[in-house]
């Protein structure tokens, strides 16, 4: 009986762990990436399938569709903060790149409609 209970608990822990994105890259300096046209360009090209991806770029690219679909429900607080920062930066400073990202990840404008009020409440004009 104890063995079965231990297996059930282990299973629940593993399922709970899968319900969050990895925090392995949470300490990346997002400001440094946004300040550098080269670094920003590399990540952007990765996301739109026009360039190679770093390991963290691959992880972002893999998680992005699910994060949009689930309203970032699996994101850590740091990931949410960085997401807001990056979206604000791209909208304000890289409108052409924003259009390309929207075309790839939200061509039917499903997510942008859902997030518009939340974004604008945070001071992000979408």
UniProtKB/Swiss-Prot annotation:
One of its GO terms (cellular component) is extracellular region. Its main location: secreted. It holds the Pfam family OS-D. GO terms for biological process: mating plug formation; metamorphosis; response to virus. InterPro entries: A10/PebIII, OS_D_A10/PebIII_sf. Keywords: Behavior, Secreted, Signal. Specifically expressed in the ejaculatory bulb and seminal fluid. Residues 1-17 form the signal peptide. It is found in: Secreted. It comes from the Eukaryota. Belongs to the insect A10/OS-D protein family. Protein component of the posterior mating plug. This is Ejaculatory bulb-specific protein 3. The lineage of its organism: Eukaryota, Metazoa, Ecdysozoa, Arthropoda, Hexapoda.
């Amino acid at each position: 009986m104890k063995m079965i209970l231990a297996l059930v608990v282990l299973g629940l822990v593993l399922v709970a762990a899968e319900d969050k994105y990895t925090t392995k890259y949470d300490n990346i300096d997002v400001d440094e990436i946004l300040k550098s046209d080269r670094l920003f360009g590399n990540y952007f090209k990765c996301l739109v399938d026009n360039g190679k991806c770093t390991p963290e770029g691959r992880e972002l690219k893999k998680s992005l569709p699910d994060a949009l679909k689930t309203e970032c429900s699996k994101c850590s607080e740091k990931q949410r903060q960085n997401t807001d920062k990056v979206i604000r930066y791209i909208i304000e400073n890289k409108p052409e790149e924003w259009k390309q990202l929207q075309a790839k990840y939200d061509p039917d404008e499903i997510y942008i409609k859902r997030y518009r009020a939340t974004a604008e409440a945070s001071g992000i004009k979408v």
